[in-house]
């Protein structure tokens, strides 16, 4: 089980010679359709030999020690085998935002909503350095165990992890893990008494409790609940808390609110898009920087 794996120290699950060779090969493939097809075929030679669901390997990524579980989490699998293809548009935009904060001589403030096992938070910590402030929010226990293991393997990172869900109103929500792909974990209103529940917080309430004065970048991926979290935030939050940059999963087909129109009204414009995500930048903050 995951608990026994995470109880071992980093390095105990280092890839053996064959696994290292496959990972080295898949990590060098071109970031195109053919490269991805080859990587999918080759990585099966490794994953089929790992225990299901929580088999893991210890590797270095972004200069950090990370234990990655490729059998039941797509983001961990992708970073393990194809780091050169991993969220390239998203990470490039975050790197640009970190550079902007550096030019302002300000520590980078990042809020990671629906953090999964924390890969975006770890990337920002590696790139922005110890002056950063990272707040990661994740409701699912198994994801949190993996997150905390990698935190322990990299002591001193400027990441605070909050075990909670975010929602449009405070209360308790049921957690529904997706055991085939942990990135698909959902939260919803409890239907009966036997469910695992977690505290639901309001985004503005959380930022206030954490003493946040501003936010440079906010990433939100919560399986269709993005509108219920951000709509009340932009209704009630002071402008100083509006993020300079937002990375959001495009789930408009299930939203109750036209969130992209709302963000446009608040002065955000689309900076770039990827297959699943949209990245928006505050034109107000850019105008202030140019003054």
Protein language model regions, located:
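Phosphate/nucleotide-binding beta-alpha loop and adjacent structural elements of enzyme active sites
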Residues: 1-291
């Amino acid at each position: 089980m995951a608990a026994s794996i995470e109880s071992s120290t980093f390095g105990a699950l280092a890839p053996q010679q064959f696994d290292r060779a496959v990972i080295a090969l898949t990590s060098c493939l071109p970031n195109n359709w053919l490269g991805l097809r080859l990587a999918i075929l080759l990585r099966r030679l490794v994953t089929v030999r790992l225990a299901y669901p929580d088999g893991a390997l210890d590797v270095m990524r972004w200069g950090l020690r990370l234990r990655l579980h490729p059998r039941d989490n797509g983001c961990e699998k992708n970073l393990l085998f194809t780091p050169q293809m991993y969220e390239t548009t998203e990470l490039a935009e975050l790197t640009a935002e970190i550079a902007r904060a550096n030019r302002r001589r300000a520590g980078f403030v990042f809020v990671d909503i629906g953090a999964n096992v924390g890969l975006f938070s770890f990337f920002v910590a590696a790139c922005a350095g110890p002056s950063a402030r990272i707040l990661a929010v994740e409701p699912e226990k198994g994801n949190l165990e993996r997150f905390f293991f990698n935190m322990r393997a990299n002591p001193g990172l400027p990441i605070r992890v909050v075990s909670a869900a975010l929602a449009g109103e405070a209360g308790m929500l049921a957690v529904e893990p997706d055991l085939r792909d942990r990135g698909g974990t959902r939260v919803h209103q409890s239907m009966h008494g036997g469910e695992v529940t977690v505290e639901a917080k309001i985004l503005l309430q959380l930022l206030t409790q954490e003493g946040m004065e501003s936010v440079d970048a906010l990433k939100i991926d919560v399986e269709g609940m993005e509108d219920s979290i951000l709509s009340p935030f932009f209704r009630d939050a002071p402008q100083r808390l509006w993020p300079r940059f937002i990375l959001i999963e495009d789930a408009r087909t299930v939203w109750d609110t036209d969130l992209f129109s709302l963000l446009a009204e608040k002065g955000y414009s689309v900076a770039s898009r990827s297959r699943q995500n949209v990245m928006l930048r505050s034109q107000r903050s850019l105008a202030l920087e140019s003054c």
